[in-house]
Curated annotation (Swiss-Prot):
Protein name as it appears in the record: GTPase HflX
Function recorded in the entry: GTPase that associates with the 50S ribosomal subunit and may have a role during protein synthesis or ribosome biogenesis. Specific for GTP.
Notes on the domains: Full-length protein is required for specific association with the 50S ribosomal subunit.
UniProt xrefs under CDD domains: HflX (cd01878)
Residues binding GTP: 236-243, 261-265, 283-286, 349-352, 374-376
Keywords: Cytoplasm, GTP-binding, Magnesium, Metal-binding, Nucleotide-binding
Length: 472
């Protein structure tokens, strides 16, 4: 396996400073770490929403070490095919640049085409970054494991491939001292073709590495499934409080910081529910509006693995003005990955930031009905744990088992799986009450003496063992 590059200590904070070395700006006073951010919307009713979108774009830029000095938004029904931004707004941007001469970067809250990016840079004399490039850079700086690095580098390579001409255009201008900026005939075109071949080869190698990682994860999932421990995945919009909730439920020390994509690598921890039942909780990468398709494709296996857990805890920042949009972003991702929506518990987090009773009715009526919590203060956590317990019990067979003392190891196995509700010692047997998941029912069938009435339908207290009660 090839060596995987890992981000340096400075991470994406050095990205803004590195732009000066990568791009030749025409004016000395320009600083590529200072930017103008722009966003568009379809009609006047979206004007308030677009301001929230700009705030998110500013946070993305800040995570990359870029300071946004000025923002603009406007209605854009039909983008320009050549520059994305229409002529009138380009002239408005040029006036802004006169007012803020230090601005060296234009950030657009969309993914634009390579030709639009090149044409804008040539027209405005700025580095032009789209939303996708910012998100890719942040993911690159947050990736800590080999798997995450493979996924991010694969997404970056796919994004870079059609944009090599743009980078060579800047290099040729540097070599020619800024002149017309055209390619040196022959040399530049040959080098672009060589670079394209190298990038394609890198995509091929990274794809092969990712397939190997996916295979390893599938094997681990099989082992985990055979153990019969129920699994929950924490999903939701970035910065919604998933890692804080994981720490609270598992007494873990997962990295928590109030910034976008603080968690990129999935982390799994054991959680003990009321009554002693063990489950596994996995914290996953946060979603975001307009998540780049290259990233969705590269992280598809990671996202699918999360969505295929037994139950999803969909964590929503109830205090955010665009909470409903964040919910829809998650549901849209289900559709993009063509995944049927699994069992979900909607968790409205950060209710401590809201006045009592001020949670919008549209959030309260989300299906399934949400649990209100604060992962920071612990409010509502017992309600969440109780609901998790109920769901696990619904998916399990409530039974009594009789273990001869010669089979004590089987009892230990059930304890390790966290499915034992109680046990008592008798003269010839160890009598155990347990909730058996489907994965363990066939294995422990010989030891089951009773199935509880909620599972077998017998109204006479505890019922007899029924073959139809068991999984295949």
């Amino acid at each position: 396996m090839d060596t995987i590059d890992t981000p340096g200590e400075q991470g994406s904070q050095s990205f803004g400073n590195s732009l000066g070395a990568r791009f030749d700006l025409p004016r000395k006073e320009q600083d590529p770490s200072q930017a103008l951010a722009v966003a568009s919307y379809q009609n006047k009713t979206d004007s308030q929403v677009v301001e929230e979108h700009l705030d998110e774009l500013i946070s993305l830029a800040d995570s990359c070490g870029i300071s946004v000095l000025e923002t603009r938004s406007w209605i854009l029904k039909t983008p320009s095919a050549s520059t994305y931004i229409n002529v009138g707004k380009l002239e408005e941007i040029e006036e802004i640049l006169k007012e803020f001469p230090s601005i060296g970067t234009l950030i657009i809250d969309e993914e634009i085409t390579p030709s639009q990016q090149r044409n804008l840079e040539k027209r405005l004399g700025l580095v032009v970054l789209d939303r996708t490039e910012l998100i890719l850079e942040i993911f690159s700086s947050r990736a800590l494991t080999a798997e995450a690095n493979i996924q991010v580098q694969l997404a970056q390579a796919r994004y870079l491939l059609p944009r090599l001409k743009r980078l060579w255009g800047h290099l040729s201008r540097q070599k020619s001292g800024g002149g017309s900026g055209g390619f040196v005939k022959g040399e530049g075109e040959k080098q672009i073709e060589l670079d394209r071949r190298m990038v394609r080869e890198r995509i091929h190698k990274l794809s092969a590495q990712l397939k190997a990682v996916i295979k390893q994860r599938a094997e681990r999932r099989k082992v985990k499934s055979r153990r019969g421990i129920p699994t929950f995945a924490l999903i939701g919009y970035t910065n919604s409080g998933k890692s804080t909730l994981l720490n609270l439920l598992t007494a873990a020390d997962t990295y928590v910081e109030d910034k976008l994509f603080a968690t990129l690598d999935p982390k799994t921890r054991k959680c003990v529910l009321p009554g002693g039942r063990h489950v596994l909780l996995t914290d996953t990468v946060g979603f975001i509006r307009k998540l780049p398709h290259t990233l969705v494709a590269a992280f598809k296996s990671t996202l699918e693995a999360a969505f295929h857990e037994d139950v999803l805890l969909h964590v929503v920042d109830a205090s955010h003005p665009l909470a409903l949009e964040h919910v829809q972003t998650t549901y849209d991702l289900f559709q993009e990955l063509k995944i049927e929506k699994p069992r979900i518990i909607t968790v409205l987090n950060k209710v401590d930031r809201l006045p009592q009773g001020s949670i919008p009715m549209k959030l309260r009526l989300l299906s399934p009905l949400p649990v209100l919590i604060s992962a920071k203060t612990g409010e509502g956590i017992q309600n969440l744990l109780s609901l998790m317990t109920e769901i696990i019990q619904e998916k399990s067979l409530h039974v009594t088992l009789n273990f001869p003392y010669t089979e004590y190891g089987k009892f230990t196995e059930l304890c390790d799986a966290g499915v034992v509700a109680s046990s008592r010692y008798q003269e010839d047997f160890l009598v155990v009450e347990a909730y058996l998941p489907k994965e363990l029912q066939k294995k422990f069938r010989p030891f089951i003496s009773y199935v509880f009435p909620e599972d077998c339908g017998d109204d006479e207290g505890r019922g007899p063992v029924l073959e139809s009660s068991f999984g295949d």
